[in-house]
């Protein structure tokens, strides 16, 4: 018999009754029922119940064991009586009568429990992640992560993509987030950077004659953490294709993403044909470029009802600014003063002056609007609003006014809040959509210059003619995002493969030819030697797994993540290094400035 086990802890069944078995694992819990000891023995695969009575030669040893000790058990497989069968366990019809027990390893007092999975402070969980990962939910999340990544690889290979591994030490690129810098010992004073994404390398692969590339790529960005973004590093499904237009990429990747969600959705419906929304449409209807389409609320422009109206606040806003609009956020079933006042209070807590509203009641077969706005604009305008928005008895509507460019973030947040408060959001589905036609540039008011709105390497719609003839702020890019349930899960574009257009694009953003050659020299040179039209995308693996597992925090689906302060509490990183190491690198740490 094997030194440690003949079976794992989820293997034995009723058909194995009578055989001798050897199991090894962790003591999940110990119970004493009238002098008979029961041990739930756990390993990677599952749990088996071990039994020892005072007549068992193993009894005295089992009396000593505690939670999370590692033991080996030899014994006989016995059937449980009908009244004690545990239908929640695959091994619930049997138990092992222990005849010999060996203690392989003891455990100190646990800083957090493994059995029962109560809520525990996250920093404790991360410091003792090896214990946290023993818990059933975390173990299941990590195993599901592995299964999802394996399914991605299988699907990509079935669709003709080849996996390539790109370098992890590369040049710093100041665009986007901050780089993690790695000092060079050999070339002192110079630095490598960990890649924020394999963007240039995957394009260079297309220049090198390869056709369809993918990689489960580690990416590194020195940015502030949040629940849907891991500090430090994350993984993305990186994709690039040669000789393609935007339609080719979308048509290729949509069934791959749909089948991935269907495989791991646990029966929840998945969008079969992903709708396509322009960036402008998404912002106008939902106040977000990553709308949650499970929320049925669609915002509408209702400005015409407020021009020269009795509600002077909105009327004056419209009269004083030609860009001003009034948008409505319909709230089905939200027609109570208590709810409307609660939303108004929430808006004030968000730094807004308030959130105007109307709610409707049916009196003697006639709809009447209630609230200050209805009172001021009058019955006719109130009824016209209701008809435009398709609202009925017991419904409400909230309003935001001003320049949409300024109020959009709040309007989108208000739409989300209303949908959640009124339980309008369908939690049991995955709603996916493409967002297309992103603006190429945006205006940086602080620095009085153009910034790239999305990806600087994308192709402008209209090509060279558009670059030369159009107002840069009206340019659209061949860029697209894939969104799901309010999260951006993928982003991509058709690349600019012309060196002349590349220089023109960067010049509009204030970067000279010399700067482009310095920062993107490898890619720029490659464009001069026969660059194929190409495009691709990158999907956030961690975020997709988070959605499929139904958790709100990426750290619940990552093995050894940092905490919110970008600290690895398990490995004590970042850490001090020795003076010798610094000297070898030619680095001196400047003392931190004191705050007077």
UniProtKB/Swiss-Prot annotation:
<keyword id="KW-0963">Cytoplasm</keyword>
<keyword id="KW-0648">Protein biosynthesis</keyword>
<dbReference type="InterPro" id="IPR012340">
    <property type="entry name" value="NA-bd_OB-fold"/>
</dbReference>
<keyword id="KW-0067">ATP-binding</keyword>
<feature type="binding site">
    <location>
        <position position="495"/>
    </location>
    <ligand>
        <name>L-aspartate</name>
    </ligand>
</feature>
<feature type="binding site">
    <location>
        <position position="221"/>
    </location>
    <ligand>
        <name>L-aspartate</name>
    </ligand>
</feature>
<dbReference type="Pfam" id="PF00152">
    <property type="entry name" value="tRNA-synt_2"/>
</dbReference>
<dbReference type="InterPro" id="IPR029351">
    <property type="entry name" value="GAD_dom"/>
</dbReference>
<comment type="function">
    <text>Aspartyl-tRNA synthetase with relaxed tRNA specificity since it is able to aspartylate not only its cognate tRNA(Asp) but also tRNA(Asn). Reaction proceeds in two steps: L-aspartate is first activated by ATP to form Asp-AMP and then transferred to the acceptor end of tRNA(Asp/Asn).</text>
</comment>
<dbReference type="InterPro" id="IPR004524">
    <property type="entry name" value="Asp-tRNA-ligase_1"/>
</dbReference>
<feature type="binding site">
    <location>
        <position position="454"/>
    </location>
    <ligand>
        <name>L-aspartate</name>
    </ligand>
</feature>
<feature type="binding site">
    <location>
        <position position="175"/>
    </location>
    <ligand>
        <name>L-aspartate</name>
    </ligand>
</feature>
<feature type="site" description="Important for tRNA non-discrimination">
    <location>
        <position position="33"/>
    </location>
</feature>
<feature type="region of interest" description="Aspartate">
    <location>
        <begin position="199"/>
        <end position="202"/>
    </location>
</feature>
<dbReference type="GO" id="GO:0005737">
    <property type="term" value="C:cytoplasm"/>
</dbReference>
<dbReference type="GO" id="GO:0050560">
    <property type="term" value="F:aspartate-tRNA(Asn) ligase activity"/>
</dbReference>
<dbReference type="InterPro" id="IPR047089">
    <property type="entry name" value="Asp-tRNA-ligase_1_N"/>
</dbReference>
<dbReference type="InterPro" id="IPR045864">
    <property type="entry name" value="aa-tRNA-synth_II/BPL/LPL"/>
</dbReference>
<dbReference type="InterPro" id="IPR006195">
    <property type="entry name" value="aa-tRNA-synth_II"/>
</dbReference>
<dbReference type="InterPro" id="IPR004115">
    <property type="entry name" value="GAD-like_sf"/>
</dbReference>
<dbReference type="InterPro" id="IPR004365">
    <property type="entry name" value="NA-bd_OB_tRNA"/>
</dbReference>
<dbReference type="InterPro" id="IPR004364">
    <property type="entry name" value="Aa-tRNA-synt_II"/>
</dbReference>
<feature type="binding site">
    <location>
        <begin position="221"/>
        <end position="223"/>
    </location>
    <ligand>
        <name>ATP</name>
    </ligand>
</feature>
<dbReference type="InterPro" id="IPR002312">
    <property type="entry name" value="Asp/Asn-tRNA-synth_IIb"/>
</dbReference>
<dbReference type="GO" id="GO:0005524">
    <property type="term" value="F:ATP binding"/>
</dbReference>
<dbReference type="Pfam" id="PF01336">
    <property type="entry name" value="tRNA_anti-codon"/>
</dbReference>
<dbReference type="InterPro" id="IPR047090">
    <property type="entry name" value="AspRS_core"/>
</dbReference>
<keyword id="KW-0030">Aminoacyl-tRNA synthetase</keyword>
<dbReference type="GO" id="GO:0003676">
    <property type="term" value="F:nucleic acid binding"/>
</dbReference>
<comment type="subunit">
    <text>Homodimer.</text>
</comment>
<dbReference type="GO" id="GO:0006422">
    <property type="term" value="P:aspartyl-tRNA aminoacylation"/>
</dbReference>
<keyword id="KW-0547">Nucleotide-binding</keyword>
<protein>
    <recommendedName>
        <fullName>Aspartate--tRNA(Asp/Asn) ligase</fullName>
        <ecNumber>6.1.1.23</ecNumber>
    </recommendedName>
</protein>
<comment type="similarity">
    <text>Belongs to the class-II aminoacyl-tRNA synthetase family. Type 1 subfamily.</text>
</comment>
<feature type="binding site">
    <location>
        <begin position="540"/>
        <end position="543"/>
    </location>
    <ligand>
        <name>ATP</name>
    </ligand>
</feature>
<feature type="binding site">
    <location>
        <position position="488"/>
    </location>
    <ligand>
        <name>ATP</name>
    </ligand>
</feature>
<dbReference type="GO" id="GO:0004815">
    <property type="term" value="F:aspartate-tRNA ligase activity"/>
</dbReference>
<dbReference type="Pfam" id="PF02938">
    <property type="entry name" value="GAD"/>
</dbReference>
<keyword id="KW-0436">Ligase</keyword>
């Amino acid at each position: 018999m094997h030194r440690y086990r003949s079976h794992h802890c989820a293997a034995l069944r009723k058909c194995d009754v009578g055989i001798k078995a050897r199991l090894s694992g962790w003591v999940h819990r110990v119970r004493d029922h009238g002098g008979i000891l029961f041990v739930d023995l756990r390993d990677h695969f599952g749990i088996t119940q071990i039994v020892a009575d005072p007549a068992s030669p193993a009894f005295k040893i089992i009396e000593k064991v505690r939670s999370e000790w590692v033991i080996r058990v030899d014994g006989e497989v016995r059937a449980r009586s009908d009244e004690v069968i545990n239908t929640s366990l695959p091994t619930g019809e049997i138990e092992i009568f222990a005849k010999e027990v060996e203690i392989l390893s003891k455990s100190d007092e646990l800083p957090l429990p493994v059995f029962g999975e109560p809520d525990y402070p996250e920093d404790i969980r991360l410091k003792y992640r090896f214990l946290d990962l023993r818990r059933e939910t975390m173990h299941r999340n990590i195993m599901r992560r592995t299964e999802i990544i394996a399914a991605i690889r299988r699907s990509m290979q079935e669709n003709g993509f080849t996996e390539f591994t790109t370098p992890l030490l590369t040049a710093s690129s100041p665009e986007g987030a901050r780089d993690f810098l790695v000092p060079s010992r050999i070339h002192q004073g110079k630095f490598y950077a960990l890649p924020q994404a394999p963007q240039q390398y995957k394009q260079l692969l297309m220049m090198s004659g390869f056709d369809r590339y993918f990689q489960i790529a580690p990416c590194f960005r020195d940015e502030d953490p949040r629940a849907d973004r891991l500090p430090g590093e994350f993984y993305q499904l990186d994709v690039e294709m040669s000789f393609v237009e935007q339609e080719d990429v979308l048509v290729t990747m949509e069934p791959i993403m749909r089948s991935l969600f269907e495989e791991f959705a646990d029966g929840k419906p998945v969008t079969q044909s992903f709708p396509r929304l322009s960036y402008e449409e998404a912002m106008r209807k939902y106040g977000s470029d990553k709308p949650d389409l499970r929320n049925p609320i669609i915002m509408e422009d209702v400005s015409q009802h407020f021009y020269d109206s009795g509600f002077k606040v909105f009327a004056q806003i419209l009269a004083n600014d030609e860009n001003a609009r009034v948008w409505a956020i319909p709230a089905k079933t939200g027609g109570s003063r208590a709810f409307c006042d609660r939303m108004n209070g929430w808006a004030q807590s968000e730094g807004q002056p308030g959130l105007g509203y109307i709610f409707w009641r049916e009196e003697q077969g006639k709809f009447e609007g209630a609230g200050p706005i209805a009172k001021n604009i009058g019955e006719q305008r109130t009824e016209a609003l209701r008809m435009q928005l398709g609202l009925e008895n017991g419904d409400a509507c909230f309003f935001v006014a001003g320049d949409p460019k300024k109020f959009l973030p709040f309007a989108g947040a208000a739409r989300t809040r209303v949908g959640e408060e009124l339980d309008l959001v369908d939690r049991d589905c995955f709603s996916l959509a493409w967002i297309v036609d992103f603006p190429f540039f945006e205006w940086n008011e602080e620095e009085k210059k153009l910034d790239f709105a999305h990806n600087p390497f994308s192709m402008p719609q209209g090509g060279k003619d558009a670059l030369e003839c159009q107002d840069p702020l009206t340019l659209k890019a061949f860029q697209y995002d894939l969104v799901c349930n309010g999260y951006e899960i993928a982003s991509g574009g058709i690349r600019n493969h012309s060196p002349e257009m590349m220089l023109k694009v960067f010049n509009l953003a204030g970067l000279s030819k010399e700067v482009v050659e310095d920062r993107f020299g490898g890619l720029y040179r490659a464009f001069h030697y026969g660059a194929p039209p190409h495009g691709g995308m990158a999907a956030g693996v961690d975020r997709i797994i988070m959605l499929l597992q139904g958790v709100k925090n990426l750290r619940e689906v990552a093995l050894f993540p940092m905490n919110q302060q970008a600290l690895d509490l398990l490995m004590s990183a970042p850490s001090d290094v020795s003076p010798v190491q610094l000297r070898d690198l030619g680095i001196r740490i400047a003392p931190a400035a004191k705050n007077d």
